[in-house]
Amino acid sequence: MTIERTFSIVKPNAVAKNAIGAIYARFESAGFTIVASKMLRLSREQAEGFYAEHKGKPFFDGLVEFMMSGPIMVQALEGENAVQRNRDIMGATNPANALAGTLRADYADSFTANAVHGSDSIESAQREIAYFFSDDEICPRA
């Protein structure tokens, strides 16, 4: 059994729908432990820094604006094969392609306003968790 950590964001559209609790319940029902969590509003600098790998792509400016449009929840999830399992729970990036019962099928409004973000690799998860949380904000539980 490989216990991993992954990073997740509940995006502004899902926060606006008051879906935080429902999404967190899905994480926990899937066997994840939420080891860090906080609500915040991204500044332009934070949003551009977080999505820096997409700078220059056609969707970058719209994504940054959307991520600044309201509060978000950021969380670190811990569990077996966490990165891939979270991606399975989220569903396809484009909600039009997301399977029924996935977070994006249930809460997304569009390709950009797709309700949740999740790390795509262990390396990304480590970088993304460190972007938002200091080591003393991570609270693993036995």
Curated annotation (Swiss-Prot):
Entry GO terms, CC: cytoplasm
Positions annotated to bind ATP: K11, F59, R87, T93, R104, N114
Protein family per UniProt: Belongs to the NDK family.
SUPFAM superfamilies: Nucleoside diphosphate kinase, NDK
Active site: H117 (pros-phosphohistidine intermediate)
Cofactor or coenzyme needed: Mg(2+)
Predominant location: cytoplasm
GO biological process: CTP biosynthetic process; GTP biosynthetic process; UTP biosynthetic process
Alphabetical keyword list: ATP-binding, Cytoplasm, Kinase, Magnesium, Metal-binding, Nucleotide metabolism, Nucleotide-binding, Phosphoprotein, Transferase
Designated name of the protein: Nucleoside diphosphate kinase
Subunit structure: Homotetramer.
Purpose of the protein: Major role in the synthesis of nucleoside triphosphates other than ATP. The ATP gamma phosphate is transferred to the NDP beta phosphate via a ping-pong mechanism, using a phosphorylated active-site intermediate.
Locations listed in the record: Cytoplasm
E.C. number(s) listed in UniProt: 2.7.4.6
Pfam families the UniProt entry points to: NDK
Example GO molecular function: ATP binding
EC primary class: transferase
Catalysed reaction equations from the record: a 2'-deoxyribonucleoside 5'-diphosphate + ATP = a 2'-deoxyribonucleoside 5'-triphosphate + ADP; a ribonucleoside 5'-diphosphate + ATP = a ribonucleoside 5'-triphosphate + ADP
SMART domains attached to this UniProt entry: NDK
Superkingdom per UniProt: Bacteria
